[in-house]
Amino acid sequence: MAIDPVILSQELISFPSITPTDNGAIDFLSNTLSQYGFTCNVLTFGNDEVQVCNLYAQLGNGHPNLCFAGHTDVVPTGDLEKWKFDPFSGHIEDNILYGRGAVDMKSAICAFIAAVSRIDFNQVNGAISLMISGDEEGNHFKYGTPAILKWLTDNNKKIDYCLVGEPTSKSSVGDTIKIGRRGSINFKIVCNGVQGHVAYPHLAQNPINDMINILHKINNTVLDEGNEYFQPSNCEITSVDVGNTANNVIPGTVTAHLNIRYNNIHTSESLFNIINNICAETTQKYQIFTSLSGDPFINYPDKYSDMLSAAIKKTTGETAVISTSGGTSDARFIKDFCPVIELGLKNDTAHKINENTSVDDINKLANIYEEFIKQFFNISQ
């Protein structure tokens, strides 16, 4: 019996799985998939501080193994008073489904499950699997998808191609496919001076002057012009702080934070060299700290991305745009294990108050996924 993706979405949204808390969402999916013949492995990883509940479910044992990747955790709701409806009620009003996770990305998970439920698995020469993380949105993501991938390797399980259900669409479902993502690196720059009284500047050294010059140079540096698949890299100054509340004190230290979203023209090392050289040209009294969120990657268009584009065209009439724009996703981990592509709902209300998606869009996404599965396994229509 085929699953209704909208009803399943309502049920999954009802679990308040604010990252990294699960609150039963993974068990619900495991129980649902078990009824359709999936072998389900509920996988919990973590430390003394947090335990993240994940799921790997597989139907069949052959190859190729087509895997759908997603996450059940959601961002916090924000001010509940500003929501039209309870964010975990899965309420539908005027054909619109409201709820935290409706877009990012519980409904996409349900659309894929519904698509699989419509398939005659006797015609599948291979396997279909789902890899569902319990922490993609939060700070404990290493216990989500990366830990599942390690478990797969340790247990000699292999996925051959992965479809990630992140909300990639812009104006209409299926208008944008992600074949890669930009990298993201954070910089913390500290300039040191000598604290003192503003009336005696000759006895102090104001580090703000050096920082202003550094940030001005960074802001006027063109990192690159982009290429065929990536937009130009860009740097954003996200904060400047001296921790000084007194008007008559020259601060001794100033700190700035930057984030660079970068394409495959650069590496984290090349960007560090650019920032470091700018600092060194200005002052010797500085420190740089970095944290890498993910390197850029691309899976160049292939027969499977062509299949997904064809599935979109057949079911919606839409000609999909191939893109690498947007933020990071768990695809940055999966790309080291197999080719990966991303397609999901429209992203215009993701993480917002009154996050919502239309019922029609959920059904449309399920239809696209179903057609893609059929083309992937060459299933007769």
UniProtKB/Swiss-Prot annotation:
InterPro entries, per database record: ArgE/DapE_CS, Bact_exopeptidase_dim_dom, DapE_proteobac, Peptidase_M20, Peptidase_M20_dimer, Peptidase_M20A
Keyword Zinc: yes
Catalytic activity: N-succinyl-(2S,6S)-2,6-diaminopimelate + H2O = (2S,6S)-2,6-diaminopimelate + succinate
Root EC class: hydrolase
Pfam family, one: Peptidase_M20
GO molecular function (one): zinc ion binding
SUPFAM superfamilies: Bacterial exopeptidase dimerisation domain (SSF55031), Zn-dependent exopeptidases (SSF53187)
Domain of life: Bacteria
Cofactor section: Zn(2+); Co(2+)
Free-text remark on how the cofactor is bound: Binds 2 Zn(2+) or Co(2+) ions per subunit.
GO biological process terms, semicolon-separated: diaminopimelate biosynthetic process; L-arginine biosynthetic process; lysine biosynthetic process via diaminopimelate
Pathway(s) it belongs to: Amino-acid biosynthesis; L-lysine biosynthesis via DAP pathway; LL-2,6-diaminopimelate from (S)-tetrahydrodipicolinate (succinylase route): step 3/3
Subunit-structure text: Homodimer.
Protein name (Swiss-Prot/TrEMBL): Succinyl-diaminopimelate desuccinylase
Top-level taxonomy: Bacteria, Pseudomonadati, Pseudomonadota, Alphaproteobacteria, Rickettsiales
Gene from which this protein is expressed: dapE
